[in-house]
């Protein structure tokens, strides 16, 4: 597994805005998608391209096109939906799979309540999106079900992550690459990231 922190001035600046306790809902949504676009750029650098000839304005011209890689984006409900538009802006042809999970606040273990995967998942690279990688339990459970369905390659994009969660995922799924805007200090006793973003789902959907 490779853990890539996208250490770019634009990412740092935008993430700093998201950390403000009183950031408006509309701004939180917009910036979450902006950061997701930048993470997507990094996560897709290894896509292979091929030369094809198209008809340009002045005649035939040779261009590069992504070669046959089928992609599905997997938002983890509900907060992951807040990054979906950003990724689809970059890869509009990606199919959308949906995984619904919530964390039991007493045990901190993930509870699955909904799964709808794209067809031919065994032929697709899956890109999981979720604002926060905290304990790692939800991500591990999502990776488990994607692998059980036959998905051959999996990546994850996150706004912030905790070291504890990264380690948990690395130990269980060393073949999955993670891209994150920042690795924060730690988890608190309730399993929340510090300094973190607060409840990203509430901030995205205006239910805080």
UniProtKB/Swiss-Prot annotation:
Query: Which pathway?
Result: Pyrimidine metabolism; UMP biosynthesis via salvage pathway; UMP from uracil: step 1/1
GO BP of this protein: UMP salvage; uracil salvage
Known cofactor(s): Mg(2+)
In alphabetical order, the GO MF annotations are: GTP binding; magnesium ion binding; uracil phosphoribosyltransferase activity
Give the reactions, separated by semicolons, that this protein catalyses. Answer: UMP + diphosphate = 5-phospho-alpha-D-ribose 1-diphosphate + uracil
The UniProt record lists the EC number as 2.4.2.9
- Per UniProt, uracil binds at 193, 198-200
* Cofactor binding note: Binds 1 Mg(2+) ion per subunit. The magnesium is bound as Mg-PRPP.
Annotated residues that bind 5-phospho-alpha-D-ribose 1-diphosphate are located at 78, 103, 130-138, 199
Q: What are the disulphide bonds in this sequence?
A: none
Q: How is its activity regulated?
A: Allosterically activated by GTP.
Query: What keywords are annotated for this sequence in UniProt?
Result: Allosteric enzyme, Glycosyltransferase, GTP-binding, Magnesium, Nucleotide-binding, Transferase
InterPro entries linked? PRibTrfase_dom, PRTase-like, Upp_B, UPRTase/APRTase, Ura_phspho_trans
Record function comment: Catalyzes the conversion of uracil and 5-phospho-alpha-D-ribose 1-diphosphate (PRPP) to UMP and diphosphate.
The UniProt similarity line reads:
Belongs to the UPRTase family.
Q: What is this protein called?
A: Uracil phosphoribosyltransferase
Q: Which organism is it from?
A: Nitratidesulfovibrio vulgaris (strain DSM 19637 / Miyazaki F) (Desulfovibrio vulgaris)
List the taxonomic lineage. Bacteria, Pseudomonadati, Thermodesulfobacteriota, Desulfovibrionia, Desulfovibrionales
